[in-house]
């Protein structure tokens, strides 16, 4: 195994026998509630959460909605849990600067920046699934970012990174 092969295995290889998946989420209160995507936790037999301070927790699903692709999971801790303030998505403007945070390709705690490209987008996933009222951004979103926070420039939560348009770069939702 040479270094070239190792690079491609680390970043591009898909092991069909590997039952693990990777996603992101965002703590929304000190009680340990986390918003993520439904597709991140769907069919999971165990959910593990790693915080930026390297603490790890087992989590449980509190609720999930396939139609909106959102889920709430919970971790339990008797220590302080850092959480993000909720923003408002009803007064967003096209051109507004945003930050997308996540774990693209397993690269933990990655931050990318961009702008809101459009509002109220409907996107089709597969043949029968349509998601409504999405925020379109040009911040880099990749596999592993799903469930991570989309923040306004003040650091308030305004959305959840959910999908990318795979036929082009720079189109995320």
Q: Which residue ranges define each predicted feature?
A:
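Serine-dependent protease modules
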Residues: 1-173
